[in-house]
A protein has these predicted regions:
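A short beta-strand element within the Helicase C-terminal
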Residues: 649, 653-678, 694-698
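Post-DEXD/H (motif II) to motif III coupling segment of the RecA-like Helicase ATP-binding lobe
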Residues: 415-475
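Long, hydrophobic alpha-helical segments
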Residues: 687-739
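Conserved interdomain linker/interface between the two RecA-like ATPase lobes of SF2 helicase motors
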Residues: 455-541
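Inter-Walker segment of RecA-like/P-loop motor cores
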Residues: 351-391
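Conserved RecA-like ASCE ATPase "motif II neighborhood" in helicase/translocase motors
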Residues: 378-421, 630-631, 635, 649-651
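ATP-dependent helicase/translocase motor core
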Residues: 2-332, 341, 345-356, 384, ...
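Conserved C-terminal RecA-like helicase domain
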Residues: 505-646
């Protein structure tokens, strides 16, 4: 009989491409279904999906007895009473365990070497992560004392892992959230409580259902971090019946708990969002199906993920890379960033997700050593180092191996050359791109687009999705012609005209620099919400067009606040930007990490600015390459911690830098497309209730450029979703400019 090998395994995704909603015919109107009836219906739906209902396990002793039975069945053993007592005391229900230690047992330490009474040692598993279907899923309800009686608990192998709090239809879902918040303070975390094993909370009022991680760092504001489940096209699944049929499908729930979650180095449990899971699943499916069809080393064997800036691409790419390293036919996984500063940031993030899962390299030689190591660690590197390695080494063992490349926002000048070398050197590779702003024919400068390099789009989650889901904020853009005599230049779009010497001179005219600097100082505290005396408010960034502009603004701003009793702490950073061709319209010029290539006047000014910084923060940085890198890192940390009030930049920090407490971007620079979206997105991270949008204050007329960019990276209706109305539009009676 002929043997056929499968070309591509079934997609078996947990984030579904299509889902038919439950019939709503039998659903009673809001107000008619009691909370108890909603709970009963929910449990019946779970039973019909294969959950075992255990009606009488509502006391701690009954819960422990059930856990014993389930763990014995999972491990094919029988504990004597004394062995079970020791197992509880030493490991399962250790009195000194915190919530974090219990979570660590589920994620990392789920196998325990137990010494039985007869002296033999055996591995006892809490969960089976290899064969996920072996884990027993049960449901109990109304556990606990009268005061804190929990609605519905999902047990996995006898351990409470998901807690569901229900409110009847029509009641605000926040009430369920507040109840969980109260329980976790009062009783979930009491000594010797198996409820410390809880990983996920689900809250529902029947019509809106959300999930979120159980983490020590939760407060009442973290309602903002609750999530709806969704289909792969990002359509939300909110109704409890639909949520139950999808999220609570047994395999889906177990995958969310054990595969699509990360317990990071700071003891925070991160449960992935549906779009992050969807992207990861589709990358893994593509690797497997391309391997089986032998479609490696071409765009057909890969694809790209379009996830908007601020939607958590780093976690998604990490999980995709981590799961790819676990595929038995994959030898190496590379995560490639396009700038040295992102190399460092990604290493820090990846190490936070899993300290031992990554190899970084300071040099091309270090990268070469990492390719030779026989382990399954993810190699994080820059495109420059990878390109140098391919140019200098014509024959390396890794070139013949099965390799996955995941590129983050790589569409710089070096990208074209690196792609040619990749095709030449690596014989069996699969490559995937992550981008918040793809290159389409409309914003491409050459022939290459994101799709022509990486293959088709595998998943998208665009800015309108993120704003709807309240994962990022809208932008409020104000254009200010502070000095009317310069207005013509500020509205000029032609780069050639703008770069003409006389126009450059006018844009840097002392009157213009002074006028803009005064405007910034006068409006800074209002824009950054620092008008209340004790309010820490936010901080800001100022994007300027050149090193010369940075110098003039830095001097003028400091000069103007000499007499101030509360001067702003101002810092600046820039470096040499080689004169390279852009690969997409609106790319922000890439600055390298070597200030030594700058002219002497720029270097002198940078040394002076770093000197001021050293005095301000009692540090000791300089302009040589290594010290400059350390300055960059220290500055990044202080901007995130709001120790720096205003950071003046030319290109650095405008892409890939996350500082949720930054809410304002001042702009004296012509931004377009990719560069505009990247720069604006520094301001729109969710932070707290005071931060309602990202403030963009421009001293060039970027209105049309803004509309062009958000239309390209969203859709024709995007403008009304992405932009808050400007002051001018409110004055004109809420008129919307047609997109």
């Amino acid at each position: 009989m002929t043997q056929y090998s499968t070309i591509a395994e079934l997609q078996n995704f947990i984030v579904l491409d299509s889902y038919t909603r439950s019939s709503m015919v039998s659903e009673p109107p809001a107000g008619y279904q009691t909370e108890a009836a909603l709970e009963r219906e929910f449990i019946e739906d779970l039973i019909s999906q294969g959950y075992e209902y255990v009606p009488s396990h509502v006391t701690p002793d009954a819960l422990l007895c059930n856990a014993r039975n389930q763990l014995q069945a999972l491990n094919n053993i029988v504990f004597t009473d004394s062995e079970w007592g020791r197992f509880l005391e030493e490991y399962l229900d250790k009195k000194s365990d915190s919530l974090a230690e219990k979570t660590k047992k589920i994620h990392d330490n789920y196998i325990y070497d137990f010494v039985f009474d007869d002296g033999h040692i055996q591995n006892i598993y809490l969960v089976d992560k290899t064969n996920i279907a072996r884990n027993k899923v049960q449901v109990i309800n109304q556990f606990g004392a009268q005061k804190n009686r929990y609605d519905v608990t999902i047990l996995v192998n006898g351990l409470p892992m998901v807690q569901v709090e229900l409110k009847k239809r029509g009641v605000a879902i926040r009430e369920a959230f507040n109840q969980v918040h109260r329980y976790s303070k009062e009783s979930f975390n009491s000594e010797s409580s198996l409820y410390k094993y809880l990983q996920v909370f689900v809250i529902s009022n029947g019509t809106d259902t959300r999930y979120f991680a159980n983490t020590v760092k939760r407060d009442k504001n973290s309602f903002d971090f609750t999530m709806n489940w969704a289909k792969s096209d990002n359509t939300l699944i909110k109704d409890l019946k639909d949520f139950t049929a999808t999220f609570f499908q047994k395999n889906t729930l177990l995958q969310v708990l054990f595969t699509y979650s990360v317990f990071d180095a700071s003891n925070t449990l991160l449960i992935m969002r549906p779009y992050q899971i969807a992207a990861t699943e589709r990358i893994l499916w593509k690797i497997k199906s391309s391997y089986q069809a032998k479609k490696w080393s071409n765009p057909e064997g890969g694809g790209y993920i379009w996830h908007t800036t601020g939607s958590g691409k780093t976690l998604t790419s990490f999980k995709a890379a981590q799961l790819a390293t676990q595929l038995d036919f994959i030898d190496k996984v590379f995560f490639v960033v396009d700038r040295k500063d992102l190399d460092y940031q990604t290493m820090k993030e990846y190490q936070r997700f899993s300290p031992d899962s990554v190899n970084g390299s300071e040099s091309t030689a270090g990268l070469k050593r990492n390719t030779e190591k026989n382990n399954d660690k993810i190699i994080v590197t820059t495109i420059q180092k990878l390109n140098n390695l391919m140019k200098s080494e014509s024959d390396l063992p890794v070139y013949q191996k099965q390799v996955v490349f995941i590129f983050d926002e790589c569409h710089r000048s070096q990208f074209g050359e690196a792609q040619k070398n990749l095709k030449k050197r690596f014989k069996r590779y699969y490559q995937f791109g992550f981008t918040g702003t793809p290159i389409f024919p409309e914003n491409a400068l050459g022939a290459e687009t994101t799709a022509s390099v990486f293959g088709r789009e595998l998943h998208s989650y665009v800015i309108t999705d993120a704003i709807r889901d309240e994962k990022v904020l809208k932008f409020k853009v104000d254009y200010n012609d502070v000095r009317p005599r310069f207005k013509n230049l500020e509205t000029e779009k032609d780069e050639i005209k703008l770069n003409a010497a006389e126009n450059q001179k006018l844009l840097l005219h002392p009157d213009r620099i002074k006028g803009i600097s005064q405007y910034i100082l006068q409006n800074f505290r209002i824009k950054t919400h620092r008008t209340q005396g004790n309010n820490k408010g936010f901080n800001a960034m100022f994007a300027v067009n050149s090193v010369e502009a940075a110098k003039l603004y830095y001097q003028e701003l400091n000069n103007l606040q000499k007499e101030s009793d509360r001067p702003l702490k101002i810092a600046t950073i820039f470096s040499f930007a080689p004169n390279e061709e852009q690969s997409a319209k609106g790319d922000i010029k890439d600055e390298n990490f070597d200030p030594s290539a700058m002219d002497s006047s720029a270097k002198e000014f940078l040394a002076k600015a770093i000197g001021d910084y050293n005095v301000m923060f009692k540090t000791n940085f300089g302009v040589d390459s290594k010290e400059f890198q350390n300055y960059y890192r220290d500055l990044a940390k202080r901007v995130k911690n709001q120790e720096v009030d205003l950071l003046i930049v030319v290109g650095m920090f405008l892409t890939g830098f996350d500082a949720p407490a930054l809410n304002t971007l001042f702009v004296d620079k012509n931004l377009r497309y990719h560069g505009l979206m990247q720069a604006f997105s520094r301001t729109n991270r969710i932070y707290d209730a005071t931060k309602t949008f990202g403030n963009i204050v421009t001293f060039r007329d970027l209105e049309q450029s803004t509309i062009d960019a958000i239309t390209l990276f969203g859709d024709k209706n995007t403008r009304n979703v992405v932009l808050e109305k400007s002051y001018k539009e409110y004055l004109e009676g809420f008129k919307d400019i047609a997109t």
